[in-house]
């Protein structure tokens, strides 16, 4: 694992079934000695998108996620199991579970859809919030 990029750290190795992925939890993406929760969610999101894309032949992006962090995984190999819960024309639901030593550690349900190519997320258009001077704030 010499490549320190996020893309390299979130690389998944799909199994023949197309719904299970092997991975290594990169030690760079940690808080102390535990993997960062956002990093783990990114792994689950990539697995869900890859499983759905392999199943439908399309490109899918995570739109929302509900995640339960049951325990922190060790910095070693793990696997992600995905299950298609609902397939739609514009949005699909996938469950992704991170497992290590046959123990479920992170469980997520993700909603995926296709983003319009070349469009920026809507939050980029928002003006910065006006924050009052500290002496005008309620204490």
Positions of predicted regions on the chain:
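Terminal targeting signals and extreme-terminal segments of soluble enzymes
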Residues: 1-139
